[in-house]
Each structure stands twice: as structure tokens, then as C-alpha cells.
């Protein structure tokens, strides 16, 4: 789950870079939403793994 979250976070960051630099101006709003959504998912995933006491899979 953490791997998927990190992958989608990277995709959101790349989409955000395109949106914020004017390459895809219409996608900037969507990229902002996706970026913050996956930041939240990353934090939740890290907390769940910390509570369970497991190390993330390599």
C-alpha cells in the first residue's frame, strides 16, 4: 500500500510541475487536489505501518 501511495505521489508531483509551470494550465487545479490527496494518503499509510510495528516492504 505504501508503494502505491508513493508512486501516485510522484505522479501527482510531476502533474503539479506541469500545471504550475503553465504547460498544462487547465490541469493545475486537478494536480493540486491530487497532490494533497496523496500527501494525506502517504501520512495515513505511514501511521498505519508505525502502529502495526512492521517495517515497510522493500
UniProtKB/Swiss-Prot annotation:
Q: Name one Pfam family in it.
A: DUF1328
Q: Which residues cross the membrane?
A: 6-26, 28-48
Give the record's GO CC terms.
Answer: plasma membrane
**InterPro entries to which the protein is assigned, alphabetical:** DUF1328
* Membrane topology type: Multi-pass membrane protein
Write out the annotated subcellular location.
Answer: Cell membrane
UniProt keywords (A-Z) are: Cell membrane, Membrane, Transmembrane, Transmembrane helix
Its family? Belongs to the UPF0391 family.
* Name of the protein in its database record: UPF0391 membrane protein Sputw3181_2781
* Organism the protein comes from: Shewanella sp. (strain W3-18-1)
Q: What is the lineage of its organism?
A: Bacteria, Pseudomonadati, Pseudomonadota, Gammaproteobacteria, Alteromonadales
